[in-house]
Amino acid sequence: MKQRYIYIAAALLTLGVTGVRSAFAGQLTTDNCQQTLHPEANDSQFSIFNSDTTSILSTLHSETLKASEDARPTTLKECLEKGLNKNYSLRIIRNEEQIAANNATMENAGLLPSVSLSAGYSGSAYGNNTTPREGDVVKNRGIYDDGIDAGIDVSWTLFDGFKTVANYDRLRELSLISSTQTRLAVENYMAELTAEYYNFVQQRQRLQNYVSAVELSRERLRIVYERWMIGSLSRLDLLQARVDFNADSAQCLKQRELLASSRIRLHELMAQDSLDVNFTTLEENIALLTLPTFDDLWMQTKENNASMIMAAQNRTLADIELRSVRSRNYPYVKLNGGYGYRTNHYGAGGTLRRNQWSGDVGVSVGFNLYDGKRRSEQRNARLNVKNAELEEYDLTLSLYTDLADLWQAYENNRMLLALEKENVVAARENYAIAHERYLLGDLSGIEMREAQKSLLDAEERILVAEYNTKVCEISLLQLSGGITAYME
């Protein structure tokens, strides 16, 4: 069985959004959303914020504030602890593990004797006529005879070609496999929850980016409106600024939905009673761990990977099944014994009561000469052993390939992140210069928008690179069996 990992291709990780955290991050408030410049203007078409826009932005701001004020910041460790205890899928698989452990007993394997106790009662009522050779007929009526019996029987297979021993080993190995399956499910769950936790961090940062973008667009719209009022800018400039502001506002609303979806998914993974509970993370940024070298990770993978361990257990199980089939080549020896007691009470005749004790013991030896399918089953069992070995080799190669791919993606994303951090410095300086020139009237609105978009895109690329690197880190730790590092 190959392990299902949480890692996703970089193309799927990128959500296609362009909002980013601005260097001039400002908080979108109800007051500044409702602010309308030059209220004395009679042309309502050019009101900077109409009633619909004001209502939407006010709702966005109030819900964002409520979510941050009502929710207690939660760490990743707290989320994992809560989820590991409450998640329904994990609780089910733990119960299945307990069932497998309960089945791994000598009794279920047939190593212990079978003991049965029986008891019974019988009675009969009758009458008769006795005619002697001399004398009158003797009539007996209402005669009742009864009897009580009890016994204990023992049956024990002393030898069956070691089949019972193989059965016991098989049950114990199945119990170990069930434990490994539980571990695999726990590791998959931890990886999924950790990835979703940092996805929430990413989505929250992205929402802050869009709020900042709206604030920047609002400021630009205010400037354009004032210049339009005095005739220094055209109606086209005003309309373009309004279109850009509305576009940023729409992106902000869409991002709120994505953040809510991530929050709901986290509550589902943690099996929360209500999915509408406000939630926020203690971590405001995506922090990366320091990973071992590739060679060290590969050594840990060979030793600790749950799928690798399960493959070895499946190979052992195939060996046990072969031993079980081969046991039919040997004779069997069975021991049977019993002890009984019976008492009878007679309603007529010269005997009133009779008590009887009896015991028996026997040994049976047999050999199955031919059953029509023994040889084919043994050949198939040997092939199953070979297949288990091949599957283990195939899994080793697959895990090495996955590890190499993940390591390459991890290293590339780290270099990309370092490059984007340098790039954002230039983008911030470029925006600062553009903003200053725009205030002086030396820069057009389109050029100003382009500088703003360049900064936002640079910040977004950092956010995506951080999350992609984190997902690769999670997958590498999951692959090498070190996912529990997030519990520390």
Annotate each predicted stretch with a short phrase.
Residues 1-33, 488:
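Bacterial Sec-dependent N-terminal signal peptides
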Residues 25-27, 31-120, 126, 273-316, ...:
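Bacterial Sec-pathway N-terminal export signals of envelope proteins
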Residues 38, 52, 58, 74-78, ...:
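Periplasmic alpha-helical coiled-coil/stalk elements that build and connect Gram-negative outer-membrane
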Residues 49-50, 247-272, 425-482:
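Short segments within alpha-helical structural elements
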Residues 53, 67-71, 118-156, 281-291, ...:
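Small/polar, glycine/serine/threonine/aspartate-rich low-complexity segments that form flexible
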Residues 75, 82, 89, 146, ...:
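Surface positions of alpha-helical coiled-coils, especially the charged/polar e/g heptad sites
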Residues 91-95, 108-109, 144, 158-186, ...:
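Sec/SRP-type N-terminal targeting helices
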